[in-house]
Amino acid sequence: MLEGRILAVSSQTKAVSGIPGAPKRVSFAKVREPLEVPGLLDVQTDSFEWLIGAQSWRERAAALGDNAVSGGLEDILAELSPIEDFNGTMSLSFSDPRFDEVKASTDECKDKDMTYAAPLFVTAEFINNNTGEIKSQTVFMGDFPMMTDKGTFIINGTERVVVSQLVRSPGVYFDMSVDKSTEKDLHSVKVIPGRGAWLEFDVDKRDTVGVRIDRKRRQPVTVLLKALGWTTEQITERFGFSEILMATLEKDNTAGTDEALLDIYRKLRPGEPPTKESAQTLLENLFFKDKRYDLARVGRYKINKKLGLNAGQPIVASTLTEEDIVATVEYLVRLHAGDTSMTAPGGVEVPVEVDDIDHFGNRRLRTVGELIQNQIRVGLSRMERVVRERMTTQDVEAITPQTLINIRPVVAAIREFFGTSQLSQFMDQNNPLSGLTHKRRLSALGPGGLSRERAGLEVRDVHPSHYGRMCPIETPEGPNIGLIGSLSVYARVNPFGFIETPYRRVVDGQVTDEVDYLTADEEDRHVVAQANSAIDREGRFTDSKILVRRKGGEVEFVASSDIDYMDVSPRQMVSVATAMIPFLEHDDANRALMGANMQRQAVPLVRSEAPLVGTGMELRAAVDAGDVIITEKTGVVEEISADYVTVMADDGSRKTYRMRKFARSNQGTCANQRPIVDEGQRVEAGQVLADGPCTENGEMALGKNLLVAIMPWEGHNYEDAIILSQRLVEEDVLTSIHIEEHEIDARDTKLGAEEITRDIPNVSDEVLADLDERGIIRIGAEVRDGDVLVGKVTPKGETELTPEERLLRAIFGEKAREVRDTSLKVPHGETGKVIGIRVFSRDEDDDLPPGVNELVRVYVAQKRKIQDGDKLAGRHGNKGVIGKILPQEDMPFLSDGTPVDIILNTHGVPRRMNIGQVLETHLGWIGKTGWNIQIASDGTRPDWAATLPEEMLSAPADSNIATPVFDGAKEDELTGLLGATLPNRDGEQMVGPDGKATLFDGRSGEPFPYPVSVGYMYIIKLHHLVDDKIHARSTGPYSMITQQPLGGKAQFGGQRFGEMECWAMQAYGAAYTLQELLTIKSDDVVGRVKVYEAIVKGENIPEPGIPESFKVLLKELQSLCLNVEVLSSDGAAITMADGDDEDLERAAANLGINLSRNEAATVDDLAN
C-alpha cells in the first residue's frame, strides 16, 4: 500500500504545524511532509540579528558551521579601522559595537511619533604612533533603529518594512553574442566586484582578445598582462595553446612592463602626464587595494568556484589577484575555442560554459542587514574624512577619540535610508497576510538594482532556478511584473545571500527523511523527483520510471537508482499567499496571480470567519504574521477581560498580555484583538491566546463562507457584476470598520501664535455644540463632512491704523485681535463617530517639532456596510463589483427554502480557466453539510474512497477542510462525497453528485429550467470601496495657469470632459451644450461668475465669453515671436481684456465667490 495513502491519517485530528490548541481541519493531503514550515519572518529577523551580532545568530551560525564569526557592524568597523592621518603619525580604530536598552516601547513610539531605536556605543582607540600613547573611550554613535519582533521598524511613529533586494552577485560572468556582419560567436567576460571598478575582457570579430578597465577604451589583453609584470616568454608559455592570444600578442606594440603601465595610464587618465610610479599606483588602487576594491566574500566565493581556484581553502582575499586575471583570460580563450572543460592551477577540472545571468545561482539577495550595513558604510566613510581633517588641525596632546569623531554623517545616512530609500517602504497593514507578504517580498528595483524602464522580458520571466526559491505566481500585474516577487514557503537565505530550498535525500533509490538545503547552482548537478511521486512504507519508489527534472528545468522519466533528491512538499514552489489558494492546480496562472494579490487587499470584517475550504496554511500564516497573541510559557489563564489576559505560568511567574483595541492600521483598517481562551483554561507555550484582525481561532480568516449560485440572473450579473442578498447588509456579514486619523497643529506665526480654542469667529452655536471647552470634539460625537473637529484661530495681518483709531485704542486699551478660522474640519465625503483623541502640548513636555506649540489628533471610525459598487473577490482571481443587492425574498432559493447569498455569472469561469472556484464551491457544500460514506457489510468501500483514511469516512456538518495545493481533493473524491453528504432536516439531499441543485425563483416561486451549481465559496471584501471612490463637485479649486478645475478626488477636482467626449457632442450636433461645457462650466473666468449671478437672481444664462486656455494659447504663440491677433467677422481686432473688472469683482463679492486665481490646496481653503 502506498505511503501517501496512510499518511493523511496523521494530519486529521492532531494539531496542525505543531501549534498547540490549533483548530481541527480534515485534510485531503496524500504526501507526508518531513520538514516543518520554517519561520516565515526569518528572512528579516535572521538578517538583522547578523547585523547587530545577536547571540541567537552566533549560535545558529555555529550550528550551521558557517565560518563567519563576526556580525555586520563588527565587520564594517574592522573594515574602517584604522583611520590614519595623512602622515601616518596617528590612528583611530573602532571595535566592540554594543547597544543599550531601547528608549521606549513599540506602542509608545507609535503614539508619540518616535523612532523605535537603541543607543549604539563603540570602543574607540586613538594611538599616537610617535609616542606609542593609546587613549581609549566609549563613544556614542547615535540611536540605531531596532527591528521589532514582527520584522518591522518604527520610524517617526509609522511602521515600515525593509524589502530584500535581488541583485546580480559579484563574480565573473561569461557571455556570448553573435556578430551581425560576420555571424561569428563573440565571447566576453565581466569581472563584477561588490565595490570598485569593472574589468571586462572580450574577443572581437578580428579574433583578438581585448580588455576594458573601468569601462574605458579597449586595448589588447597582453598590455594588462605585461603591466602585471609578465614577460612575453611567460605569456607564450602559459597561453601558447591559444592562437587568438598569440595573434593579440603580435599586434601589441608595448615592450615591457613600464610601457604597458604608461599605455594603461594614458587610457584611464587622458590628458594627465604619465609616470611609471603613478601608473603603478593607479593600477594597484583599482584592483588590488581593499580600500578601493572589494569583491565581498560572495564575489570571492563565486570566482573561486567558477575558475576552480583555491579549492577547499577558506575565503579570505576580497581583492583581485594576478591569478584571478590570468585564469579568467584562459577561461575566455578556451570558451572561444569551443573547449568544454579546463584544468585549474590546483588540478581541479572545471566545466567551460557561458553563464545565464537570470539564474538564481548568479542572483543573490541583499537582505535588510546588508542594506543597512551598506548605508552605515556610506556614513562612516563621510565621518572618516572629518576625522582625518581634525587630526591635522587639532593639537596632538589634546586629542581624544571623542574630539575627533562627528557622528552626524552616520546618523544622517541611517535616517536617510529608513526615510527615503526605495527599499524602506510604508508597511502594508491591510490584513495580516499583506504584512507577512510585504516582509517576504523580493525586489529587483532600488539602488544598485534594475529600473522598470530598462528591464527586459528575460529578467522578468519565470526561470527554472526559481523553483522552491521565488514564487512563479505572486507578482504585481503592472509595470513591475516579474521585478517584484515573493519568497517561497520553504526557502531560506544562506550566508552568501543565495536562496536555498530543501530536498529529501534519496540514497540508492530509497527516500530518507534527511533534508539538504541546496542553492540553485548545487541543484543543477542533481536529479530531483517531485514530492507526489508514489513511495511505499520503506520509502522506495513504487513505479519503475519516475518523472524527474534536471538542469535547466528539463523533465524526463528515469530509474529510481538515478535519483539524488526529492521535493519535501508539493507547496514548495509557491509563496504563502499562493499556498492559501485551494485547488490552485486547477487555476490558470494569470488568475492565480490575481487571487494571490487580491487576498492581500482583503479588509478585516467585523466578524472574521475561517474558510470552510482551506489549504492547511492558514494557521502558520496567521501565527507568523504576528497579529495574534501567542502564549510564551505553559500555564493557566488567571484573569481575562476584553483588554488583557493574565497567564500564571507553571514556574510561578505571571505575564499579562495586552490587546490592541480598535487601533488604526497604516491603511486605515481596524486592528482589533480579542481573547479566545477562558478563565481557568490551561494553555500551552505557543498556543494562540487572542485573535487579531482577519483571524479566527488562530487561523487566517480574510473573508466569509457564502452560499453561492453560479447562474445568470436577469442580466444583472453581466460582465462580472455580482448580485448580493440584502441579508448580508442587514446582518453585517460583510461590514468592516475603517478608522481615519485627522491631525492639526497650532504653530507660532510671524503675526503671533495660533490658538486651539472654542471661540471661533462667525460660527453658530450648533456647529460648536459637540466641542468641549478646549475647542476639541467630544468622544462619541457623530460627525459628517464640514463639521468642526478642532477649533483653531490664526492671527490676521492688521492694517495701518488711522490717528483717530490709535487715540481710541490708547484710551480704551487693546482691541480684540483680528483672527481667521483655520479649524480642522471633516473632509468632503467623510462621516463617522469620534473614537479617540490625542493631545500633545509643549507645556506638558511632549516632544514636538520646532515652532509647534500644540498638536491634536482625532480618530474617526466609520462602519461601512456592503453596498452597490464595492468590490468582492474569491481566491481564484474571480473578482467583481456588486451590481445589485436584492431583497432576501427575491433571491433564488433551494428546495428547503434556503435563499442563496450571492449569484455569480457562469461566463466568469470557462474563458478564464479558473476551475478551482467551482471545485471549491462543491467542496464547501460538502464541508458545510458534512458527509457519511456508506461501507458495505463486508467492509469494502466505494472505489473512489479506497485511498481515504479511516477518519475521513464521515464528518459532521460545518467541518473545516484542508485541500493543500498540488496535493488536494481529486475530482472523483468530490463526486463521491457530494453523493454522500448528510441530508437536511427533511431527509432530503439538496445537491446531487454533480454538485447541482434545482433552484426556485424567489419572485415567482417557479423552478429555474436547469439545475444550478450551488455551494459555499469563500468571498473576500476588497479595499476598493465605493465610498472612497465616489466624488462630485459643484464649485472648487481651479488651476492657476489654465483656470480649469483641478482633477481627482484628492484635489476636489472636476470631471474631465476630454477629446473623445467632445467628439461625441459634435457627432450629435449638440453645439450649445458643447459651448457651455468648454466655457462657462470650465475656464471662462468672467462667464462663470456671471452665470452664478444669473442663477442666483433667476435670470437667463448670459452668452459665454472667451476661455482662459485660449488666452494661454495666444501667449504661447506670442512667446514664439508670432504676432497673433483675433479678428471679428468685420475684420476688427478683438482685445483679450477681462471685460469690466469692477463689475465682475462687485458681483463676486456680493455672491461670496473667491476670484483670486490661487490654486487652493484643500477644500477648506476654498471655504476660507
From Swiss-Prot:
Stored SUPFAM superfamilies: beta and beta-prime subunits of DNA dependent RNA-polymerase
GO cellular component, one term: DNA-directed RNA polymerase complex
Protein name per the record: DNA-directed RNA polymerase subunit beta
Keywords: DNA-directed RNA polymerase, Nucleotidyltransferase, Transcription, Transferase
Gene: rpoB
Classification via CDD domains: RNA_pol_B_RPB2
Biological process, per Gene Ontology: DNA-templated transcription
Enzyme class: transferase
